[in-house]
C-alpha cells in the first residue's frame, strides 16, 4: 500500500455526500476544516495536492429551493452556477488560514479528449503546483451537456490524475472499499484490501453503492481505477466521512488499493511513443545533444519544419542527418513552428504577436 506522505503528487476526490449534509443541504464545515488540516500536513511533507470536489449542485439546489427530487438539466446547471461560488468560498475559508492558496479549475470532457486543451490543462496544473497552490477541480456543470460530460467525479478524478501525473488518486467515499458483494445486502461479503489486476470478475463485484447525493457507485470507481492504474497512478477507495480521512488512510485505515505496475512518467512515455507523427522537426547538432541530456527542444535548435500539424500533435524529432531520434508533442502548430524556428525563445512574442511557451517540445512531452 502506498504512502500519501511519500508521494510526489496526490489527487483527492470528495463526493457530495461527504461535503454536504443530505438532510439540511448545509456544508459540513467541521469535516472540511479537518480535511484542510490533512492537506496542509501533506503539503508540509512536500506532496502536491489536487482536490476534485463535488458539491456545487448540492449546495446550489438548497439556495434555489429546488427540493430533494430529480433536477432537470436547466435546474442542475442553475444550481451549479450558484453552488460553485459557495464551494470555492468554502475551500478558501479553510485553506487560507493554513497559508495555502486555493485555485478553481472547471473542466469538461473535451479538456482531456482534445489534445491541445489537454496540454493547456496540464500546463495550468503544473504552473499552479509549482507555486504551491491547491487546485480544486470540478466538472463545469453549468455548461456541460451529456455529450461533453465526464458524468461522475470518480471518472473526472482519474482523468485529472492522469493529466497531472499524480502518483496516487484517493476516492473519499461513504464506503471503505470494494467487497466481493454488496455488504449492505450480503453478510458474507469480504473486503478486498489490494487489487493488482482489474479482471472481469472484479468488475462484476462492483455493485451500485451510491448514496442520495452522489452520482457514482462502486462500478464507476472501479472504472476510474482502470484509467488511473493504466497511467501509473495507484488508487485508493476509502471511508471519507470520518474526521481527518487522509491522515487515517496514511495510518492504515481500511481501504481498497488498486496498484499501478509502472510510474506515471513511464506510462506517459509509452503513450507518446505509440503515437503516429503528423510532422517532423529537424534539429541542429547542439539541440540534438541537449535532448540527449534531458533538455527541452527550443525553437533556436530547429532548422526545418515539415508536415501539417496542430498544437499538441505528435511530431518526429530528427538529427541533422534526418535520422529519427524521438517523438514529441509540439507546443505549436506547423505554421507557428515555421515562423519561430531558429529564433530565441524571447523573440516569440514579437514574431507571433502573443506570449508563447519557451519550448517547442517540452522534455516531459517527448520520448527518445
UniProtKB/Swiss-Prot annotation:
ATP binds at residues 13, 173-174. Substrate binds at residues 54, 141, 153. It catalyses: L-glutamate + ATP = L-glutamyl 5-phosphate + ADP. The keyword Kinase applies. CDD domains: AAK_G5K_ProB, PUA_G5K. Residues 278-355 form the PUA domain. GO terms for biological process: L-proline biosynthetic process. This is Glutamate 5-kinase. It comes from Jannaschia sp. (strain CCS1). The gene is proB.
